[in-house]
Amino acid sequence: MAVIKMKPTSPGMRGMVKISRDHLHKGEPYAPLLEPQFQKSGRNNNGHITVRHKGGGHKHHYRVVDFKRNKDAIPAKVERIEYDPNRTAHIALLCYADGERTYIIAPRGLEVGATLISGSEAPIRVGNTLPIRNIPVGSTIHCIEMQIGKGAQIARSAGTSATLLAREGTYAQVRMRSGEVRKIHIECRATIGEVANEEHSLRRLGKAGVKRWMGIRPTVRGVVMNPVDHPHGGGEGKTGEGRHPVDPWGNLTKGYRTRNNKRTQVMIVSRRKK
């Protein structure tokens, strides 16, 4: 993939950096795997805003991606690699030997025409999915399950991966890109390799309108609001917070730990690096 630096023909184009999609499929997506995607704009069933800074954006269909990869011992051929507007990673369309087609997260180095397979007997090759107990220690993996049979939840974004560090009994230790080391059951599945589109982090939007196309509305700082709207608001002229930083509801932010799931705390061997 190539990085395209746009010429400064307008203020919005100045500084804009795009990621080339020349290697991706040019036609329409596979229609049977499309579902309607309804814009909620951050509102709940009462119409109240529950997630701020959401609304608008370009319409798109949801691509149904197979995160379980549980069609064991059936080879699948990569028909094409496509752009997915719902995620940073690219997706690959697989055609199984029995005729079924599914989308998967495209790993780095996957080429059209390659053959993939899932199951405990699958070879250690990029794009193949196996239980963690069958993956060699030290391997780079992505699309990792956290619960057996639930489907991949870890390392699904562009350029992400994890490293299998060790196996102890029924659990394996996996180090994520954040530095967190977590215990995962050895019967959970993972895919060999790392996610493609690693240049995504080099993208520069160039103008505010691109954010609006993505369905992201402006974020206003609390210090420029009125006291009725935010704890940081008010004051004569330009002032600071005057207190420890908090969110609009008064909860501490900027470093305050918010993790509240004590049930799975024992699965974290070491916390992520700041």
UniProtKB/Swiss-Prot annotation:
One of its GO terms (biological process) is cytoplasmic translation. This is Large ribosomal subunit protein uL2. The gene is rplB. Residues 224-256 are annotated as: Disordered. Signal peptide: none annotated. SMART domains: Ribosomal_L2, Ribosomal_L2_C. Part of the 50S ribosomal subunit. Forms a bridge to the 30S subunit in the 70S ribosome. One of the primary rRNA binding proteins. Required for association of the 30S and 50S subunits to form the 70S ribosome, for tRNA binding and peptide bond formation. It has been suggested to have peptidyltransferase activity; this is somewhat controversial. Makes several contacts with the 16S rRNA in the 70S ribosome. It comes from Polaromonas sp. (strain JS666 / ATCC BAA-500). Keywords: Ribonucleoprotein, Ribosomal protein, RNA-binding, rRNA-binding.
